[in-house]
């Protein structure tokens, strides 16, 4: 996958390109990350990249010309080799909230360009003419789009074949099937008097699978019940969830 970044602070993306799973993916050429700084497209000696908003008000906007030129340069670079255009995404609090389904959809793209805003945002006309989609990582405001962009890259990279040791790791993560992840355990067998669930050491794969599914359903129902509203549960999942609710009700009735 190729990802282009439009940012006033491209150095921040060393956290993605130089470290961890994504850094390894870059070294293996499974993920290519290329940055453009709008400051490099300015025409004045001060390299100005902000401008006043029409209508007044607090704050500044990103200057149109350097930002647009940077985006267009990234677009041209994206399709230079094979003619495949990149989807251009603006990280914005007004965008669609990023979730696992969205991550999986974005991961199907060969190329993405991520535009990181600063100040109070960017000119609406640039959104209309240069941006394909707006995405948000949550209902809160940050000082820029770099951290949301890194979050998106990290999440999407997990679905690039070869990035994870086992591709099933991405498929078994929290939200991969709409459910929260089950609990995980490693050595020692007993930690501060708390033992590993016996079923996980039984070697019985079907029992382990069923236990993990039950734990995922229980955790989702207790912590994020709204996630269950949009799921089409299997017969097995419905039976397990009903049993979980009955046991929970029984325990509460005794307390």
UniProtKB/Swiss-Prot annotation:
Top-tier EC class: transferase
Record key words, sorted: Cytoplasm, Methyltransferase, S-adenosyl-L-methionine, Transferase, tRNA processing
Taxonomic lineage from the root: Bacteria, Pseudomonadati, Pseudomonadota, Gammaproteobacteria, Pasteurellales
Binding site for S-adenosyl-L-methionine: 117, 137-142
Gene Ontology terms: biological process: tRNA N1-guanine methylation
InterPro entries: Alpha/beta_knot_MTases, tRNA_m1G_MeTrfase_C_sf, tRNA_m1G_MeTrfase_TrmD, tRNA_m1G_MTases_N, tRNA_MeTrfase_TRMD/TRM10
Pfam family, one: tRNA_m1G_MT
Primary localisation category: cytoplasm
Catalysed reactions, as listed in the record: guanosine(37) in tRNA + S-adenosyl-L-methionine = N(1)-methylguanosine(37) in tRNA + S-adenosyl-L-homocysteine + H(+)
PANTHER family: TRNA (GUANINE-N(1)-)-METHYLTRANSFERASE
Residues passing through the membrane, by range: none
Protein family (similarity comment): Belongs to the RNA methyltransferase TrmD family.
Parts forming coiled coils: none
CC terms in the record's Gene Ontology section: cytosol
A single MF term (Gene Ontology): tRNA (guanine(37)-N1)-methyltransferase activity
Disulfide bonds: none
Subunit structure: Homodimer.
Function according to Swiss-Prot or TrEMBL: Specifically methylates guanosine-37 in various tRNAs.
Protein name: tRNA (guanine-N(1)-)-methyltransferase
Highest taxon listed in the record's lineage: Bacteria
Record's keyword annotation contains S-adenosyl-L-methionine: yes
Subcellular location: Cytoplasm
EC number: 2.1.1.228
Gene: trmD
Organism: Glaesserella parasuis serovar 5 (strain SH0165)
């Amino acid at each position: 996958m190729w990802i282009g970044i439009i940012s006033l602070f491209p150095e921040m993306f060393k956290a993605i390109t130089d470290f961890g799973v994504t850094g390894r993916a870059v070294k293996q050429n499974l993920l290519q990350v290329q940055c453009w700084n709008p400051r490099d497209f300015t025409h004045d000696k001060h390299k100005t990249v902000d401008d006043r908003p029409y209508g007044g008000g607090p704050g500044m906007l990103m200057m149109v010309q350097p930002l647009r030129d940077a985006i267009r340069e990234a677009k041209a670079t994206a399709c230079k080799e094979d003619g495949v255009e990149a989807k251009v995404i603006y990280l914005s609090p007004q965008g669609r909230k990023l979730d696992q389904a969205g991550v999986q959809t974005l991961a199907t793209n060969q190329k993405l360009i991520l535009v990181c805003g600063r100040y109070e945002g960017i000119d609406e006309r640039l959104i209309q003419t240069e941006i394909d989609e707006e995405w948000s990582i949550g209902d809160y405001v940050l000082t820029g789009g770099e951290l949301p962009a890194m979050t998106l890259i990290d999440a999407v990279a997990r679905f690039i074949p070869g990035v994870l040791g086992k591709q099933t790791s991405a498929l078994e993560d929290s939200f991969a099937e709409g459910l929260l992840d089950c609990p995980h355990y490693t050595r020692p067998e007993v930690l501060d008097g708390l033992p590993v669930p016996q079923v996980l050491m039984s070697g019985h794969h079907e029992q382990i699978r069923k236990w993990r599914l039950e734990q995922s359903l229980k955790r989702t129902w207790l912590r994020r019940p709204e996630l269950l509203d949009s799921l089409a549960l299997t017969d097995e999942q419905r039976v397990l969830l009903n049993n979980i609710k009955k046991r929970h009700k029984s325990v509460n009735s005794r307390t």
